[in-house]
Amino acid sequence: MSVTEEDLCHHMKVVVRVRPENTKEKAAGFHKVVHVVDKHILVFDPKQEEVSFFHGKKTTNQNVIKKQNKDLKFVFDAVFDETSTQSEVFEHTTKPILRSFLNGYNCTVLAYGATGAGKTHTMLGSADEPGVMYLTMLHLYKCMDEIKEEKICSTAVSYLEVYNEQIRDLLVNSGPLAVREDTQKGVVVHGLTLHQPKSSEEILHLLDNGNKNRTQHPTDMNATSSRSHAVFQIYLRQQDKTASINQNVRIAKMSLIDLAGSERASTSGAKGTRFVEGTNINRSLLALGNVINALADSKRKNQHIPYRNSKLTRLLKDSLGGNCQTIMIAAVSPSSVFYDDTYNTLKYANRAKDIKSSLKSNVLNVNNHITQYVKICNEQKAEILLLKEKLKAYEEQKAFTNENDQAKLMISNPQEKEIERFQEILNCLFQNREEIRQEYLKLEMLLKENELKSFYQQQCHKQIEMMCSEDKVEKATGKRDHRLAMLKTRRSYLEKRREEELKQFDENTNWLHRVEKEMGLLSQNGHIPKELKKDLHCHHLHLQNKDLKAQIRHMMDLACLQEQQHRQTEAVLNALLPTLRKQYCTLKEAGLSNAAFESDFKEIEHLVERKKVVVWADQTAEQPKQNDLPGISVLMTFPQLGPVQPIPCCSSSGGTNLVKIPTEKRTRRKLMPSPLKGQHTLKSPPSQSVQLNDSLSKELQPIVYTPEDCRKAFQNPSTVTLMKPSSFTTSFQAISSNINSDNCLKMLCEVAIPHNRRKECGQEDLDSTFTICEDIKSSKCKLPEQESLPNDNKDILQRLDPSSFSTKHSMPVPSMVPSYMAMTTAAKRKRKLTSSTSNSSLTADVNSGFAKRVRQDNSSEKHLQENKPTMEHKRNICKINPSMVRKFGRNISKGNLR
């Protein structure tokens, strides 16, 4: 980005911008006095040819009163017409001189022109169209970021205005500031504050605050007329990062100036303060014009330049004719209302082209003190280490590149040709493979869509049957059958095509195996060459990428189909629910609502509220009638590409194949399996045996599964089965007897113990629990494995007296399913402890010395009268050996104590 002095233009660069006409000028019908010819030439007050004819002859009518057109041609460095944008002005004015600014040259951009010509709009702009100042700051910091690795850059800014020949700081509240001249620094404003922003956002914030403090008042010519000259200056200091005793520091200054417009009191209507402001503005602009005339007059040498006639010209001393590269933006109006102002602006701009500057880069050679030598040496050492690391990385990369080049040269020409041939074959194979796979996924999506549409047709027909009359149902049935037949035919066709695509895919896979085998023959060890192996892997990855993208597209299509059906269902529900509520309220007010209707309405309310139902861990709750709609996981699952089986002669197992993912039915997890699920079979290992621990054997443990009598209604209430763990037997202990005339329960006690608990049968053997279940036919159907158990010498089968299981208050078990509250009551009462034997008598020969606890079902007459099927469970404990004491966990529930 270095710029030499020979490359720079020593003349002031002048551009002209013509603003568009405003609504007021268009309404008045003023003619234009500025005509833009091209990007460099414009004509002021062009001639208008008026040709008149009288009786077919040309006549020249000379109007003596009419003023002759000047028809002046001006040539500038750039001319912007009415359609130009802020970015175009920035690209041709400020952006080119930023290179000079970064190389240490002072630069100035000033906007000159009459009031209302568009100077402030060009320099500052608006929120929608930022001006030159804003764009300059953004581009400057962008350039600084590009060179931050080579140079250390620091910036400082100041913002002032010249108002009524007084200088004020726009960034802080201060009084008038004095202008002084320094032999080294040049023109200096004493007391002007400098701010050091860290980013372009911060510097733009400072610029915005300064614009708010600037003096502006409306006049007859301009609603937002600037009453002062604004000067925004940026100081840039650059220093090389390379540590050295002699440091080269570049210091440059850029000035962005927005001048106030010249005006006439007769046209602007200025009075009082506005008149004084206009006078001072014209005075400073007149001094500026004189300076421009003096600098442009090359005939007179050593001529005095009147810089001190105004504060403005004193500030612009460096910018005009000094060590500065200056660009003037002359803003003019095309309307004839500003005829004189436009002419004067163009005249001064044309003279400013002749101003020459003496450009010199501001580079200072700073000699560091001897005390800084140690710091400089350390910085140089760190820089040397950094450069060595970069050089080492470069050499390693170069060596790796050389090895690859040598490896390529070592490959013989015939082998290269073979590799190229196989690469072409792989391209053709995978291109065909990709087409087959895409077609297969498309067919799979169409089949899923066909399945969904079939289900939606059936669902719609069911709704019509529930809602419409018989005639409409008959018509709908005909339409449904016709559509289902079409869908079925379509499905058969799609399935046939899918099978064909699968066959083609298998053929492609076989060809791929053959090609892999042939590629393995290229090397002596039977492995595929690295080049071909990489190509093969890339082809597989590309195929997987295409496959996943296609699956995503198909999923979106299916989701849209489901969303459409969901919206239709939602519309039906939104129409039905208010109608149902209205009918319910009407029937209730008329007294026509019965208990069944109330129950149905409450059930619908629960469904609408989405309330959850509490169930036991192993309880199989009555599920509503399932529809045939496949789950979302099934619909959104496509056959995936699995790895191809590796071939024997090739070590690489690249390739893909179609693998169908089996869909698993979602099941509810159980905390502990029920002992009635047939877990104690011979096929199950000992580690999977059912643990039949008593719920009260270890302090407080809740029942982890629902009692069978509460979970399911009995088929034969006169027979039950008792399951009990024993510590002395490893097989089943069956006890059966006939029922008596008082509907006593027939009980068959089958005792089983898991293998993993044979060594842990200490005190817990006393904590046994009987579980009532069905017997005879139902038990034979449920546990067929029990009949096939081997009866070895260790198995003991004992028949006990049925009178020992007779109960005092025995009654048939109700056949209906108990309510949730009944199940909860049964669970609570299961933990009750009754040590007396007055309620029930349990007599048995206990030769092994263990305790038994029997749960019985009792119900009171009061409950029978109220038709509430509640079941009481009482425990009866037989006489046990005094040395064996039963331990129970305490339950702090009040409902368990009587």
Swiss-Prot record:
Keywords annotated in UniProt: ATP-binding, Cell projection, Coiled coil, Cytoplasm, Cytoskeleton, Glycoprotein, Isopeptide bond, Microtubule, Motor protein, Nucleotide-binding, Nucleus, Phosphoprotein, Protein transport, Transport, Ubl conjugation
Stated induction or repression of this protein's expression: By estrogen.
Sites of Phosphoserine modification: 674, 695, 838
Domain of life: Eukaryota
Any one cellular-component term (Gene Ontology): cytoplasm
Coiled-coil segments: 368-453
Entry binding sites for ATP: 113-120
Subcellular location: Cell projection, Ruffle; Cytoplasm; Nucleus; Cytoplasm, Cytoskeleton, Microtubule organizing center, Centrosome
Biased composition annotated in UniProt, kind: Basic and acidic residues: 854-871
Pfam families named in the record: Kinesin (PF00225)
Entry-linked SMART domains: KISc
Cysteines paired by S-S bonds: none
Post-translational note: Glycosylated.
GO biological-process terms attached to the record: cellular response to estradiol stimulus; male meiotic nuclear division; microtubule depolymerization; microtubule-based movement; mitotic metaphase chromosome alignment; mitotic sister chromatid segregation; protein transport; regulation of microtubule cytoskeleton organization
Glycyl lysine isopeptide (Lys-Gly) (interchain with G-Cter in SUMO2) crosslink residues: 24, 683, 794, 868, 874
Domain Kinesin motor: 11-355
Keyword Lipid metabolism in record: no
Signal peptide start and end residues: none
MF term (GO), any: ATP binding
Gene3D superfamilies reported in the protein's UniProt record: Kinesin motor domain
Family: Belongs to the TRAFAC class myosin-kinesin ATPase superfamily. Kinesin family.
Record protein name field: Kinesin-like protein KIF18A
Biological source species: Homo sapiens (Human)
Gene giving rise to this polypeptide: KIF18A
